[in-house]
């Protein structure tokens, strides 16, 4: 069996093109484009790379943005003061807190400081609660991107057995809630480091999502023949054949499972591009909300991504 690649780059390109059309409509209506403010604390190379990639994506979709940099030793007070200013700045529609933060900062406290209507990452407790209660709100970008990839690939969700390996508040837990919600209707098992018999559980999955943060951990014994595999992980691993002596890989051992699965997301080029596309989407929705073009918290997952209206949220 030759696995079908679920192309996140192409999916993100299509989404970005549709977003650009909506940005033009917003400009025509109110004379402004969506504006994303990124907060970067410290100079972690990976975080700097991610922020730069997001800024390039903003430009492609004709959104505006800027990065606010604070030193690694910045205090809670300094970070919260910056966020307060951005909350009050009418030209800013979305605020992104680049994670991880330096160890001395409480990420939950910082994310809570972002105004819910500008929380385009979907990390504020009000947006998390809205997701849990099947109410419209900002959906975290990676789970939103995963569901869009599955739908675009025409993977049946209703009644599907989904196993998610990894229970982070950013991916695993919100994705479990989203996939189990009315409109997706999957049967979801959420696994973690204390799960017993992990391989035996994973091999039952119609859809297996690897989001555990361990390079190439998911091998052939974890995957049922004909399953769909979504790889959320991203790691740099040593590789003497690579130009810089390192290669990107995911949480899945791609070569070990590709012959068994029906479809799989590659790393790179799978989940990552769609995560950024959903960040742009949420930022646009925040701007439309600020302009009075959509009802409060109607910045939901499927608005204008697969031909549905903004109100047709499958909860």
Curated annotation (Swiss-Prot):
<dbReference type="GO" id="GO:0009086">
    <property type="term" value="P:methionine biosynthetic process"/>
</dbReference>
<keyword id="KW-0486">Methionine biosynthesis</keyword>
<dbReference type="GO" id="GO:0035999">
    <property type="term" value="P:tetrahydrofolate interconversion"/>
</dbReference>
<keyword id="KW-0511">Multifunctional enzyme</keyword>
<keyword id="KW-0658">Purine biosynthesis</keyword>
<dbReference type="GO" id="GO:0000105">
    <property type="term" value="P:L-histidine biosynthetic process"/>
</dbReference>
<comment type="similarity">
    <text>Belongs to the tetrahydrofolate dehydrogenase/cyclohydrolase family.</text>
</comment>
<keyword id="KW-0521">NADP</keyword>
<dbReference type="Pfam" id="PF00763">
    <property type="entry name" value="THF_DHG_CYH"/>
</dbReference>
<dbReference type="GO" id="GO:0005829">
    <property type="term" value="C:cytosol"/>
</dbReference>
<keyword id="KW-0368">Histidine biosynthesis</keyword>
<dbReference type="GO" id="GO:0004477">
    <property type="term" value="F:methenyltetrahydrofolate cyclohydrolase activity"/>
</dbReference>
<keyword id="KW-0028">Amino-acid biosynthesis</keyword>
<dbReference type="GO" id="GO:0006164">
    <property type="term" value="P:purine nucleotide biosynthetic process"/>
</dbReference>
<keyword id="KW-0554">One-carbon metabolism</keyword>
<dbReference type="InterPro" id="IPR046346">
    <property type="entry name" value="Aminoacid_DH-like_N_sf"/>
</dbReference>
<dbReference type="InterPro" id="IPR000672">
    <property type="entry name" value="THF_DH/CycHdrlase"/>
</dbReference>
<keyword id="KW-0560">Oxidoreductase</keyword>
<dbReference type="Pfam" id="PF02882">
    <property type="entry name" value="THF_DHG_CYH_C"/>
</dbReference>
<comment type="subunit">
    <text>Homodimer.</text>
</comment>
<comment type="pathway">
    <text>One-carbon metabolism; tetrahydrofolate interconversion.</text>
</comment>
<protein>
    <recommendedName>
        <fullName>Bifunctional protein FolD</fullName>
        <ecNumber>1.5.1.5</ecNumber>
        <ecNumber>3.5.4.9</ecNumber>
    </recommendedName>
</protein>
<feature type="binding site">
    <location>
        <begin position="166"/>
        <end position="168"/>
    </location>
    <ligand>
        <name>NADP(+)</name>
    </ligand>
</feature>
<dbReference type="InterPro" id="IPR020867">
    <property type="entry name" value="THF_DH/CycHdrlase_CS"/>
</dbReference>
<dbReference type="InterPro" id="IPR020631">
    <property type="entry name" value="THF_DH/CycHdrlase_NAD-bd_dom"/>
</dbReference>
<keyword id="KW-0378">Hydrolase</keyword>
<comment type="function">
    <text>Catalyzes the oxidation of 5,10-methylenetetrahydrofolate to 5,10-methenyltetrahydrofolate and then the hydrolysis of 5,10-methenyltetrahydrofolate to 10-formyltetrahydrofolate.</text>
</comment>
<dbReference type="GO" id="GO:0004488">
    <property type="term" value="F:methylenetetrahydrofolate dehydrogenase (NADP+) activity"/>
</dbReference>
<feature type="binding site">
    <location>
        <position position="234"/>
    </location>
    <ligand>
        <name>NADP(+)</name>
    </ligand>
</feature>
<dbReference type="InterPro" id="IPR036291">
    <property type="entry name" value="NAD(P)-bd_dom_sf"/>
</dbReference>
<feature type="binding site">
    <location>
        <position position="193"/>
    </location>
    <ligand>
        <name>NADP(+)</name>
    </ligand>
</feature>
<dbReference type="InterPro" id="IPR020630">
    <property type="entry name" value="THF_DH/CycHdrlase_cat_dom"/>
</dbReference>
């Amino acid at each position: 069996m030759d696995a079908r690649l679920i192309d996140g780059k192409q999916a993100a390109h299509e989404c970005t093109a549709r977003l650009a059309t909506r940005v033009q409509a917003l400009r025509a209506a109110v004379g402004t484009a969506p504006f994303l403010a990124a907060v970067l604390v410290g100079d972690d190379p990976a975080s700097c790379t991610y922020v730069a990639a997001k800024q390039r994506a903003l430009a492609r979709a004709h959104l505006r943005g800027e990065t606010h940099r604070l030193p690694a030793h910045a205090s809670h007070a300094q970070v919260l003061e910056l966020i307060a200013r951005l909350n009050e700045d009418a030209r800013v529609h979305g605020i992104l807190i680049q994670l991880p933060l330096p160890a001395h900062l409480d990420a939950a406290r910082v994310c809570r400081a972002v105004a819910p209507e500008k929380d385009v990452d979907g990390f504020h407790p009000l947006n998390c609660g809205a997701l849990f209660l099947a109410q419209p709100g900002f959906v975290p970008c990676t789970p939103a991107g995963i569901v869009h990839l599955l739908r675009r690939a025409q993977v049946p969700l209703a009644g599907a057995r989904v196993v998610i390996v990894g229970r982070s508040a950013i991916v695993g837990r919100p994705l479990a809630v989203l996939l189990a919600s009315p409109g997706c209707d999957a049967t979801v098992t959420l696994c973690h480091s204390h799960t017993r018999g992990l391989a035996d559980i994973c091999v039952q999955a119609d859809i297996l999502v690897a989001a555990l943060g361990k390079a190439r951990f998911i091998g052939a014994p974890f995957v049922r023949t004909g399953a769909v595999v979504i790889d959320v992980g991203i790691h740099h691993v040593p590789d003497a054949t690579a130009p810089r002596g390192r290669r990107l890989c995911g949480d899945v051992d791609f070569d070990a499972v590709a012959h068994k699965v029906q479809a799989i997301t590659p790393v790179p080029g799978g989940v990552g591009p769609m995560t950024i596309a959903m960040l742009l989407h949420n930022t646009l929705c925040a701007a439309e909300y600020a302009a009075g073009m959509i009802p409060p918290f109607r910045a939901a997952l499927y608005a204008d991504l697969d031909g549905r209206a903004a109100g047709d949220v499958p909860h």
